[in-house]
Amino acid sequence: MLSPQQELPLSEYSSLYDIVVPQDNLLRRINDLVDFTFVYQELANKYCKDNGRTAESPIRMFKYLLLKTIYDISDVDVVERSRYDMSFKYFLGMAPEEDVINSSSLCKFRKLRLEDMDLMNLLIQKSVEIAIEKGIIKSRTIIVDATHTEARSNPYSPIEILRLRSKQLRKVLYAMDDNITQTLPSKNKEDDLAHELDYTKDLLKLITSDASLSEVPAVKQRLNMLKETLSDIEDHYTTSKDADARIGHKTEDSSFFGYKTHIAMSDDRIITAATVTSGEKGDGPQLKELVEQSRKNGMEVNTVIGDTAYSGSENLRLAEDEEKGFTLVSKLHPAISHGLRKDEDKFDYNKDAGMFVCPAGHMAIRKARQGKKDGKWNQSMTYFFDIEKCKTCSRREGCYKEGAKSKTYSIPIRNEEQKRQLGFQKSQEFKDIARQRYKIEAKNAELKQVYGYDKALSYGLDGMQMQGAMTIFAANIKRILKLS
């Protein structure tokens, strides 16, 4: 059962907040900036209003998740810190003496209350609305790019991830006491998961039995991470796989297993739209949705800045549309057009590797320019794929001809739209605007380094979208506070 609204706690100790939580405290400023009643309004229909025991306020539960994102800590740690950190209690709307929730409630809140809702667009729209009200968004330019996030199960096998977490814990212990090595259990040197699980349990048992070690904040944080990893490995045992994650390519020689978050950001560094896809998806096809969503969220878009991945023929035509067009500042690449293929047969261009990726996720192994340079017909760029992969591919029907000795994908170099874009690309105006693209690279780095967005916290596309929504909301709110 859900209470009509979150009630302010009455306590004789509430005056403590005026003493220990200063006016310039980050969490106090966020509380003053954001009216969190929108969370209640969005989630009210997820609760029963007249049956069952009274549920924890959805606003408070949402704030727990926001704290977890801002400080990049685990469920256990955010609840534990809320027990003694007065700024956390103030932010959560708790009385100083009030007890905290059980950390497992956060997992239930994510699964039962936040599923089946467009949390990403809801939170971005709210933060953009606040930025517009504060007069922070002044430009009509957005910068687009994609950032990758490693899946939770990648790139390690169960043994490797256990060893990594154990190593991180031991490193903190060694920093406290060099002689502690003698008391720790012997490392497992065999490539056997059962033995590694036994070693991990022995290590956890030893550390948790010594309060002088387990209660040290740095040790406790690593200890909780190892516990979560152990629990996850035991649930999946020999396999820990994310069914929604896919292999994407950062460069021609390096790849990752996970997801991509496609971001549109204003010139003032406020994220105005975002979509999350599996790792193999191309950047260019997301441009239309990013522009539309930015406009829907209240951003006026006249100019779009992006790298070569966004200068495909479809995007060039979109930019020239009379009603919904914009100035596209994106350098041409001779290999960006999909030609005449159907949507389901399109190959995506990976700007980092400089190669095309087929619908099945396989990247070309080499490329060659074909045709006469000064001939009657335009030259084409031909991409060659690994024929052995094509022979066993589940999507080979209609794509690979049985018995063929090669599989290629060719595209014409420079069409009419590209010719016009090339002329604009040579102008000083293009060069001046393009210099602003560095801002989104800095934003991507901030999301990963400050908010831990380099690694997925859960499995599946839904979990990744939820993580992205909370991360972007936190980043936007902190940016608004900085510019206010």
Where are the predicted features?
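Anion-binding and metal-coordination hotspots
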Residues: 74-77, 82, 98-99, 107-484
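Charged, often Cys/His-bearing segments associated with DNA-binding zinc-finger transcription factors
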Residues: 1-34, 41, 396-419
